[in-house]
């Protein structure tokens, strides 16, 4: 890892300016949400684990949940000078990592995460301009704050820009 890379852990988020790159690994059923203000060149990345917090009575880490992490990321970006109407989103992850014959056993958390992220971004009026979701492989997301490009590295499938 070099000085221009910022690692985002699971149930974590951060905001950066050029020339920084925001990187998150281990996107299985989790979703990486990259938000970018191309005018101010401010980028933010969140790594969420679960679709929504409403089923939990005690939320120890709000960054685990799509419904709480996205507003937190927006607030952090706006404090850096980002303008919500300029934001565009790119998302990755949401895989079905376990091959159970009965999909309801795990309630397809990857698909539920993906739907929840899209719903929350829609509520904030943030368009998703690119995505790499679904499937059954883990991903790494590398987000450049220079130009908003997101590189996806998928296990056994190489590298793809979204």
UniProtKB/Swiss-Prot annotation:
It is an enzyme of class 3 (hydrolase). Pfam families: CheD. It catalyses: L-glutaminyl-[protein] + H2O = L-glutamyl-[protein] + NH4(+). It comes from the Bacteria. Its EC number is 3.5.1.44. InterPro entries: CheD-like_sf, Chemorcpt_Glu_NH3ase_CheD, Cytotoxic_necrot_fac-like_cat. One of its GO terms (biological process) is chemotaxis. One of its GO terms (molecular function) is protein-glutamine glutaminase activity. Keywords: Chemotaxis, Hydrolase. The keyword NADP does not apply. NCBIfam families: PRK13490.1. Probably deamidates glutamine residues to glutamate on methyl-accepting chemotaxis receptors (MCPs), playing an important role in chemotaxis. Belongs to the CheD family. This is Probable chemoreceptor glutamine deamidase CheD. The lineage of its organism: Bacteria, Bacillati, Bacillota, Clostridia, Eubacteriales. The gene is cheD.
